[in-house]
């Protein structure tokens, strides 16, 4: 309303007042969070649980060593960031008993417990398994990220959470998740172009859109490929193909198969995108963009994921958040 220059003048005038000339030592107000002092003791005896293959796989993907000897970081894979009340209470108990009363939220919509004694890992895993949060594959392609979409955001165009649930089935195929180069990829989706689901920095990303079909509006997604936030960040390249929402999982499967079949030895997905070009992916996606006439056999295309009525775009003022 007043403009940046007038605002700057007001600040400079205020700083000439006597209160601004007084010396001030902020040391007494500084808060140092000494996590190590609250860390669980390494001398405590924990239960010894059978080392199953499932537990070993979880150890390899969800647990990292801390610099402090004897302590681990446990990454809890939270599907699409959703927790029910029982899970929330048990996670709080894990935090208090095994992690010094702390937990961190990651950009992958997961939880990270630091300062977990190595000897306590089996107990922690056993509790996580009892509340269905012991899945392996944290920060891998199976760790799909989605914003709330139309589930709760008024700016959402599509049900990105519904798509995320459907996507997990595709990327969890053994032939894909066991491929080292595919496993390290990331799939993210947003229910609108605002990008709260971080689709623009994913290896394969989507944002919600609307397609005009013969029978009316169809929920759809714009496709982005080749993004990355590992090391140097790069924004994904937008393809020219808009995919109906119900065809997106199949389209992702086709893109991954295309990459796996045509990559060079050790070639990561971003490098493959640079070499093959976006146009080659548009050819792969061409078979998934058709918008059929509306009839009893095609009605599913006109209904969004996790919905039961024909799609209609409805947007309003709202706040976006992962």
Q: What is each PLM-predicted segment?
A:
Residues 1-322:
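Peripheral terminal and linker regions in Fe-S/redox and tRNA-modifying enzymes
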């Amino acid at each position: 309303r007043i403009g940046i220059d007038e605002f700057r003048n007001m600040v400079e005038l205020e700083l000439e007042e006597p209160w601004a000339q007084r010396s001030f030592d902020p040391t007494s107000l500084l808060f140092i969070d000494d996590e190590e002092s609250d860390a669980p003791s390494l001398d405590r005896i924990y239960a010894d649980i059978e080392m199953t293959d499932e537990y070993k796989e979880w150890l390899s993907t969800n647990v990292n060593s801390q610099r402090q000897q004897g302590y681990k970081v446990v990454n809890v894979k939270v599907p699409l960031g959703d927790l029910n009340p029982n899970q929330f209470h048990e996670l709080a108990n894990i935090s208090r008993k095994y992690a010094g009363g702390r937990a961190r939220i990651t950009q992958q919509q997961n939880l990270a417990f630091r300062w977990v004694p190595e000897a306590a890992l089996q107990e922690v895993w056993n509790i996580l398994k009892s509340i269905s949060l012991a899945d392996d594959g944290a920060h891998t392609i199976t760790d799909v990220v989605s914003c709330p979409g139309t589930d709760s955001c008024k700016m959402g165009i599509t049900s990105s959470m519904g798509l995320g649930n459907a996507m997990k089935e595709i990327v969890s195929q053994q032939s894909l998740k066991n491929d080292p180069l595919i496993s390290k990829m990331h799939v993210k989706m947003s229910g609108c172009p605002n990008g709260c689901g971080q689709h623009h920095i994913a290896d394969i990303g989507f944002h919600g859109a609307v397609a005009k079909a013969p029978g009316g509006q169809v929920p759809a997604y714009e496709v982005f490929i080749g993004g990355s936030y590992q090391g140097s960040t790069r924004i994904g390249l937008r393809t020219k193909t808009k995919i109906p929402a119900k065809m997106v999982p199949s389209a992702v499967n086709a893109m991954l198969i295309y990459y796996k079949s045509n990559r060079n030895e050790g070639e990561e997905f971003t490098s493959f995108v640079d070499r093959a070009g976006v146009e080659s992916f548009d050819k792969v996606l061409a078979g998934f963009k058709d918008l059929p006439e509306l009839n009893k056999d095609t009605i599913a295309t006109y209904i969004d994921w996790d919905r039961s009525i024909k799609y209609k775009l409805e947007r309003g003022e709202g706040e976006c958040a992962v």
